[in-house]
From Swiss-Prot:
Protein name according to UniProt: Acetylglutamate kinase
Organism: Marinobacter nauticus (strain ATCC 700491 / DSM 11845 / VT8) (Marinobacter aquaeolei)
Major site of localization recorded for this protein: cytoplasm
The EC number(s) this enzyme carries: 2.7.2.8
Residues the record lists as binding substrate: 60-61, 82, 187
Residues of the site described as Transition state stabilizer: 25, 247
Stored InterPro entries: AceGlu_kinase-like_sf, AcgluKinase_fam, ArgB, Asp/Glu/Uridylate_kinase, Glu/AcGlu_kinase, NAGK-C
Gene behind the chain: argB
GO molecular function (one): acetylglutamate kinase activity
Keywords: Amino-acid biosynthesis, Arginine biosynthesis, ATP-binding, Cytoplasm, Kinase, Nucleotide-binding, Transferase
Length: 290
């Protein structure tokens, strides 16, 4: 009876979201715990089975760091971003485009899905431009541009490739590597790639899996539903700060550029994606334009 009740409660959501696109940024604990990996793969397969088009964009920072350490390649960070020279970029491509991407693809396929792994270099899926980091320290006479190597931002997304895959019942799994005008590879923040893919696809939802239970008030209570304006107010008054800011800016940009809702959800919870999409309660914070 309990199973029947769960399925019955999910039916209106299945009907509402059939045929819609959901972009999921997969990272954090959900990528490290074996049980959470399996629950995520099952969630994605089930979404596809009920007619939703999931698109997975994944990170892999810890795995990159581990291999660089094993290879005795020193990592340096500027404003939280890994300085990526040519040697480091080779490692990034091996880890993201090879190890991590293929593990996710295999896991989804093992649970009955049909996943295909891509990097942004495949069919020019993600065109990139070099990211400029500017040091505006008051000690400097003028702003200083810091070269952080092969770190980029999204210039454009080839939606035709993704459309072709989703129409053929395939689940795209995208590694956040872009290609520059000269053919060079660029390492791009996975949240940013997920957000730009969601915007380009006019997705119904952008879901960012995190290691937190959602956005919290100053009283440490999870804020389950916010408008873009309310989020901007929370940034302004310092409630949202630090490492969460880049994720929130991606989520805000998405809802301001055609995505219906963005979700900051707790990837430490089993079946977090299904709970967020198919239940009233959810497992995080929903952000809408208004």
């Amino acid at each position: 009876m309990q199973v029947a009740s769960v399925l019955s409660r999910g039916l209106p959501y299945i009907q509402r979201f059939t045929g819609k696109t959901v972009v999921i940024k997969y990272g954090g604990n959900a990528m490290e715990n074996e049980d959470l990996k399996s629950s995520f793969a099952r969630d994605v397969v089930l979404m596809k089975l009920v007619g939703i088009n999931p698109i997975v964009v994944h990170g892999g920072g810890p795995q990159i760091g581990e291999l660089l350490e094993r290879l005795n390649i020193q990592s340096r960070f500027v404003n939280g971003m890994r300085v990526t020279d040519a040697e480091t970029m080779d490692v990034v491509e091996m880890v993201l485009g090879g190890q991590v991407n293929k593990e996710i693809v295999s896991l989804i396929n093992a649970h009955g899905g049909t996943a295909v792994g891509l990097t942004g270099k495949d069919a020019n899926l993600i065109r990139a431009r070099k990211l400029e980091v500017v040091n505006r320290s008051p000690e400097l006479e003028r702003p200083e541009i810091i070269d952080i190597g092969h770190v980029g931002e999204v210039a454009s997304v080839n939606v035709d490739v993704i459309d072709m895959l989703t129409r053929s019942n395939v689940i795209p799994v995208i590694a956040p590597i872009g290609v520059g005008p000269d053919g060079a590879s660029y390492n791009i923040n996975a949240d940013l790639v997920a957000g730009k893919v969601a915007e380009a696809m006019k997705a119904e939802k952008l879901i960012l899996l995190t290691n937190v239970s959602g956005l919290k008030s100053k009283e440490d209570k999870v804020l389950t539903g916010l408008t873009a304006q309310q989020v901007n107010d929370l940034i302004e008054d310092g409630t949202i700060h630090g490492g969460m800011l880049p994720k929130i800016r991606c989520a805000l940009s998405a809802v301001e550029n055609g995505v219906r809702t963005s979700h900051i959800i707790d990837g430490r919870v089993a079946h977090a994606c299904l709970l967020e999409i198919f239940t009233d309660e959810g497992v995080g914070t929903l952000i809408s334009r208004n």
